[in-house]
Amino acid sequence: LKLLAKFNLMLVVLFGLGLLLVSQLSLRFLENNARDQTIQQARLMMSSARSTRDYTEEELDPLLEKTPDHAQRFLPQTIPFYAATVTFNNLRKDYPDYTYKEAALNPTNPRDRADQWEADIIGYFRNHPDKTEIIGERPTPTGSAIYLSQPISASAGCLECHGAPAAAPPTEISTYGTSNGFGWKLNEVIGAQIVSVPTEVPLAVAHQAFRTLLLYLAVTFLATLAVIDVGLYYIVIMPLRQLASRADLVSKGDLSQPEFVVKGKDEIAEVTKSFNRMYLSLIKAMRMLDE
């Protein structure tokens, strides 16, 4: 192999090893970062739903209670759980991969009843009152999913409808009956907010970023290799070829060649000086032999 080919081969091997190491580290970093961003997005959406629930309970419900038909007609819009769920469903128009549920062990609406894995989360919050959030992964029929969960505790406003059945609004009783959603206790963990998103969503983001990173690295390497090759050719290879060509002519007896012009003070210049001294010494020696 010629010098340029050897140099390129060395750079390609070094770049390949470096790329292998960088790809392993960067992929893991990008996957973790995408997962963290997904969880943060879920946390913001959950906070939005919780704010809607609090607003409904503290601001909207007291106003609706003053309307003339409130006592005769059940309005689901006055239920904080309902308002939070509707708000999140509206957010899902922009984030369709996210799902939200306010799961409860004893809900009024059977739709909100916790599944087994959701009940386990609620039980964990009950047994660990200092915990305010759980992040985990679980298997689903369509693949793994990341979930973010925060506890829901019964407030004084909740007990107006979910305490004793006798104290509940008649319109609620007529709509849902008395079998579910009663007997809650103040500050008791009665459910959990749960946001789920398929694991493939953050992984897809990470892998797209990873492919883009590899593309940029490859382009940068090729551009760097091209610049190095051009510099190596004009700074090292071309002067060496000229020296080799002149040395070949001199070795064949052509002593009419002029001296090389020395440019710079680098190693190539030193080789050129040495060649000139050798060439001049050879000319003197040949003249002495002729005499």
Task: Annotate each PLM feature.
Residues S48-D54, E58, P62-S155:
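Extracytoplasmic ligand-binding sensor domains of the Cache superfamily
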Residues S23-L30, T220-I237:
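Cytosolic-side ends of inner-membrane transmembrane helices, especially those
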Residues A154-A166, T171-G177:
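The canonical Cys-X-X-Cys-His
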Residues P169-G183, T199-Y216:
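Membrane-interface helix-start motif
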